[in-house]
Regions:
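Short low-complexity stretches enriched in small and charged residues
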Residues: 23-32, 81-83, 148-153, 158-161, ...
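Generic structural hydrophobic/aromatic packing signal, biased to beta-strands
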Residues: 21-23, 36-38, 72, 109, ...
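Secondary-structure boundary elements
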Residues: 13, 80, 84, 90-155, ...
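Glycine-rich loops and low-complexity Gly/Arg-rich segments
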Residues: 32-36, 45-48, 62-64, 95-100, ...
Length: 264
């Protein structure tokens, strides 16, 4: 499978800041070609690359100017290995987190999914979240978590993922968020899905059902969107002036949502 992805981010800067980009495909994915460029006021800046325990690759730089422009391109030829299960995964990803308030949603989870476990539970959560929420672009705030999403009954991909994660954790199923490139997604943008740890394997949980899971390409992995944002800045405020994402696959296939799959 050959997948090609691009991303461009244009920022307005108001002063010195540290920019942290999380747009590169995760470490370990077989790359045929890749480039990452950053310019500040038109001059090239060399970022530092940092890789975390799950293979998330961060590109960070200290900048001072009026504009910053980032361009990323990658060609992936092949698939990644099966996601590794870390020694602490079944602890870290059972805890409530900033956007996944599993403790608050425990009564809801217990009443809605009584008697279900394993892969049957994953399918039930996917169907339930898909039924309860409506995908509406721009309907949620950056501060919205799973509880507010359920009350609003609408959201975007990260909101669907946060609610799925919170419900699963409340049912003692470790769950986490993955930021991905998603060939077939419309409108095209960064996508977020949940992953659930069942029978010793991480399985994709995407209640939006907006893109084929087999083609998804991992970028970042974490507890929730706080760990996986495509851009973080520390210091002076920044303004997003432009964002464009593309993702295509050479062998596009329809998704059989009755079967479980893994991020590869």
């Amino acid at each position: 499978m050959k997948r090609t992805v691009t991303c461009s981010i244009d920022l307005g800067l108001t002063g010195p800041a540290r920019l942290v980009y999380s747009v590169a495909v995760a470490a370990g994915i077989p790359l045929a070609d890749e480039s990452f460029t950053l310019t500040v006021d038109g001059a090239p800046v060399l970022p530092t690359e940092i890789t975390d325990v799950h293979g998330t690759r961060l590109h960070t730089a200290y900048v001072d100017g009026s504009t910053a422009s980032m361009r990323y391109e990658a060609v992936v030829d092949g698939i990644d290995a099966v996601p590794v299960v870390g020694d602490a995964d079944d602890i870290v990803y059972l805890r409530p987190s900033r956007y996944c308030e599993s403790d608050s949603l425990a009564p809801t989870a217990a009443s809605e999914f009584t008697g279900l476990s394993g892969l049957d539970l994953l399918q039930a959560v996917i169907s339930w979240v898909n039924d309860k929420l409506t995908y509406v672009t721009g309907s949620s705030l950056p501060t919205d978590g799973a509880v507010r999403t359920l009350l609003a009954r609408q959201g975007v991909c990260r909101d669907f993922a946060h609610l799925s994660i919170a419900l699963l954790r409340a049912l003692n199923v470790p769950a986490r968020l993955a930021a991905v490139y998603a060939p077939g997604l419309s409108p095209m943008e960064f996508h977020a899905v949940a992953e659930a740890l069942v029978d010793g394997q991480w399985w994709v949980v995407d209640a939006t059902q907006l893109a084929p899971r087999q083609s998804l390409l991992r970028v970042a992995t974490g507890r929730d969107a706080a760990d996986t944002a495509f851009l973080t800045n520390f210091g002076a405020a920044t303004q997003l002036n432009g964002l464009e994402v593309t993702a295509v696959v050479d062998d596009f296939a329809l998704d059989d949502t009755t079967k479980l799959t893994q991020l590869r």
